[in-house]
């Protein structure tokens, strides 16, 4: 690698990463807006809504992992000059979004039955159920949008995603105001209204991106809608073979944070509410490396199609370096102004929130120390997805997030009595271990000029 090739790769990366990262931040603003409005409803709706939203996002992110396999497959096909495969992959990805969405909706509708086993209060369960029964109607469009986002990103047509997400977020925020608070003659539905608004925002984004694939001239060259009624099991199997491991890896990663949320609820409503204010802030920040990881997946997948190991290595390291610097810059204000951040969610002058503030401040300090490591692990994982390397990273995720992260969280939080701060320290240790393992795996796989035969992607069973 030399400075010229690094600069060229950085330019390609930023052209793709900036709109994707901005879109992810805007999409996370849906949860941010929901959390702020939950906080204005009171501590109990904030705690219950935070738990309900966290579990919903966990399930949606896990299921989206299956259809996220479309992105590296399309990027590899384009890099190899096999354009005839591209539309077929996307069509079957859309089919899988619908077929997968139906059982996922059923799972969400039954979540409230599990909550007593997890130590949640009756009030928290009742409020959370209201949110779940409304927001579950956003599952199918959420999966469809995730698939189409990967499709257009792999074809370097990602700029449309940001305005679509911004419009969907606007729809969600307006719906929250009207339905959550009962403004302008609408009924006051509180958490039910917030859930319905989130689902509506997902439908707006999905339908907008679906229409864009049929209208945009550079995308129309790929016959996306040709034979769209035809289900092709061979291509679906190809997506599932790659996507199931991505989905489980996402579940393992997000499962750590979901378990921490559940453990916070076992400590108490106040700890859960404090955790929600901190975690929502971190989620918003984390959307930048998440969007950048999609860009790295595309860039590495393109080099995979060209069978160039050094090119893939350069693409991955450029992405990791860029996100590490960005997260370092964001960690500084997080560490210096924690009270101001908590004040976004709750009224600091209200004595009822004093306990929440005392719990949230040390959590934010721990979170600021872990930001860089969190960004590195996510982008390094995206680079591995670009290589279509998923099964070993899944095992590494289990080791880092569950054995180290969950294990140390339980020990520090409960056995040593460190409470909510101990839970945050434990999950940060899991993130740190994951970042090191993923980066080492990526460097090992890209150490040669050409990829080893075992890394060569399997040919898709489709024809021109």
Curated annotation (Swiss-Prot):
UniProt-recorded name of the protein: Probable multidrug resistance protein NorM
CDD domains named among the record's database cross-references: MATE_NorM_like
Disulfide bonds: none
Transmembrane segments: 13-32, 52-74, 94-116, 131-153, 160-182, 192-214, 244-266, 281-303, 315-337, 352-373, 394-416, 421-443
Database matches in Pfam families: MatE (PF01554)
One example GO MF annotation: xenobiotic transmembrane transporter activity
Annotated family: Belongs to the multi antimicrobial extrusion (MATE) (TC 2.A.66.1) family.
Predominant cellular place of this UniProt entry's protein: membrane
InterPro entries in the record: MATE_fam (IPR002528), MATE_MdtK (IPR050222)
Recorded GO CC terms: plasma membrane
The protein's role, per its UniProt record: Multidrug efflux pump.
Keywords from the named record: Antiport, Cell inner membrane, Cell membrane, Ion transport, Membrane, Transmembrane, Transmembrane helix, Transport
Membrane topology label: Multi-pass membrane protein
An individual GO BP term: monoatomic ion transport
Top-rank taxon: Bacteria
Subcellular localization: Cell inner membrane
